[in-house]
Amino acid sequence: MQKLHTANKAADSLGADEILETLLVEAGTARELPTNEHKLLSFLGLEQLSFDFMHELSFLDTPAKPEGELRAALHMAERVIATQSGMAEQRKRFSMFHEIAHCVLPEHQSKLFVDTDQTLSMWTRIRLEREANKFAADLLFQGKLFTEQALGLETSLTTALTLAPKFGASYEATLRRYAETHVLPCAVIVYDKVGRNEESYVEDDEYRVQYTVSSVPFRKLYFSGGVSMDSDSCKARDIYSPHEVWSVGRVMENELVIASQGKEKWRFETEVFSNGYKVFQFLKRPVKRSARS
């Protein structure tokens, strides 16, 4: 990586946070929203191309196709970031930021990085890929800038939905960032659709909890030992208010009772939203504390 002029140390001796801050400043996109990926590419001397990896694997110059669906690649010698053609814009931007992370983080010394759905996932176990994902998210949300703006608004699911397009991020990525970085106790439960009976009503659609994200204060106050649900799956009507008509894109309110692994139960005020693929339930505050069971 080239010298970061505003840094007091060589680029390879900087921490990730220092690299992030100086990269945004020197590329001229600090506090510019959404983060301008073209300025980052230009500053780093990188070119972005779109490929159909199924038919153009020769670009990768790799002896074997990696496991999983290819989404992005960084070719250091050619100074090229390649992304899968046809990807949604938000996913494409995150993939580009992931490859930029490989380019600038000191220990990421490979001449070729090839990334799939697995390595771009928040669940990857590969250390370098976890680091690249974190740096990509920090580029997307400009470090602490997102949190600073979020804290100036109401603690609500609606706040995250409002900020998402401003930062050029998906609703899911924004809700994750919102919950995990908030200074107040809050959490989001993400439900994935299990299946749908075409002969039944939408409220009979079945969902499972895919994952949960919570702020540090939330974990300290309520569920330091983890959250447990009563069952592995539930109906849509159990997530939304059963007394109101709901639709994709509409935020609704409901209450939810959940228990810690120690079986301590809490009833929370929640807000519920669906992007058409998943359902997000934002836990705001406890309504009342029930007796231990």
Mark where each language-model region is.
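Active-site hotspot residues in diverse enzymes, especially metal/ion-binding acidic/histidine motifs
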Residues: M1-S293
